[in-house]
C-alpha cells in the first residue's frame, strides 16, 4: 500500500509566481511527497503525491488559473486497473 496514493499534476498560469514560495508552502502545509514545482513567473508545473489532492487544487487555484489537471490513483494503477 502506498503512503500517498494520488499523483496530482497541473499547470498554474499566474503573475509573479515564485517556485521557492510554492515549494515552501507545500512542504509546510500539505501532506505528501515527490514534489516538483518548476517554471517561471508566469507558468508553474506542479507534480505531487498526496492523499488530499483537493488541498493541492485549492492552494494552486489561489495563485492563478489552473489547468491540465490530472489526478491519478496510483494504488489502482499498481493493481493493473485504470487510475
Residue ranges and their predicted role:
Residues 1-83:
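N-terminal loops that bind phosphate or other acidic moieties
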Amino acid at each position: 500500500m502506498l503512503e500517498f496514493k494520488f499523483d496530482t499534476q497541473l499547470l498554474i498560469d499566474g503573475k509573479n509566481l515564485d517556485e521557492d514560495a510554492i515549494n515552501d508552502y507545500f512542504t509546510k502545509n500539505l501532506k505528501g511527497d515527490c514534489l516538483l514545482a518548476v517554471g517561471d513567473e508566469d507558468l508553474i508545473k506542479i507534480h505531487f503525491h498526496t492523499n488530499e489532492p483537493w488541498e493541492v487544487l485549492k492552494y494552486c487555484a489561489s495563485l492563478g488559473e489552473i489547468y491540465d489537471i490530472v489526478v491519478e490513483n496510483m494504488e489502482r494503477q499498481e493493481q493493473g486497473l485504470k487510475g
